[in-house]
Amino acid sequence: MKKILAIVLTLALSLSLTSAFAGEPLTIIATENPHAEVLELVKDDLAALGYDLEITVVSDYVVENPATSAGDVMANFFQHLPYLAGYNAEVSEEEQLVPVVYTHFEPMAIYSGTKTSLDDIADGDAIAVPNDPVNENRALLLLQAAGLITLPEGTTLESTCTPADIVDNPYNLTIQELNAELIPGARADVAYAVINGNNATLVDLVPYVDGLYAETADSEAAEAYVNVIVVKPENAEAEWVKALEQVIYTQKVYDLIVDSGFAPTFEVPAAETAAE
């Protein structure tokens, strides 16, 4: 009986240490707005649950998935589902990552460069677009939706179109492919710029305020490009992941996302809504 009790106590202690990751902090790497801001907002709530959150903020988001795969951090928060799928398709099975907390949609939009209205578009104008496969295809679909180009019939969000695939370019637009994080700073060199949500917020651009043409909150893109917190598969059911869900799916996080100009993709629990 004593032996059984000892085993039970040992297991309980082990589970306790696992839950709190042996006293180590919960490390998450994130881009600034709204990702790191969301994490900062819930930091005290996590502390109340016994988790010491450490946030590393970066502007170059391409480092976040490799850092998570390598175990340098426990999670990351910056990307949408197609970007994650693209990463997983390029890495080994040991480096795969999975989404665990679904948060919001960040519209991609066409912003002004040297021109302030799409009505002013002229033959030969240059438009900057992201050069990574997922966001480039998305940007080209946005240009098509705005009536500026035509892509092959059947092109979807899952396609990987590049400027070479454009079948009709009535304005003879020059599509300049740049690293996504460099596009906001290149606006003075192009007529228009297609900027994703992360990078737009870094220069205080709000899609539905400053954008000349943006993806809508009820579009296919809104469902497909939901932003997620990502972890290694073995951590998907961890207690700290459940804690993240608990503190993020709240009214104050919902409001922060809305105030940032984005669209939350979760519902606030009825119990919290009723309490207010």
Regions found by a protein language model. Give the residues of each.
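Alpha-to-beta junction loops
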Residues: S69-Q79, D125, L148, P170-L173, ...
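A bilobed periplasmic-binding-protein/Venus flytrap-type ligand-binding module shared by bacterial periplasmic
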Residues: E106-L118, A224-A238
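Pocket-flanking alpha-helical
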Residues: Y61-E93, T201-D204
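Short helix-initiation/N-cap motifs at beta->coil->alpha
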Residues: T56-P66, T156-G185
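A conserved helix-loop-strand patch within extracytoplasmic ligand-binding domains
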Residues: Q96-I149
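Ligand-binding clefts/hinges and TM-proximal coupling segments of bilobed small-molecule sensing domains
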Residues: P130-G147, P152-S159, K242-E276
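Ligand-binding "clamshell"
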Residues: G86-V100, G113-T116, D189, V194, ...
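Short, well-ordered beta-strand elements
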Residues: G23-N33, Y51-V57, D125-I127
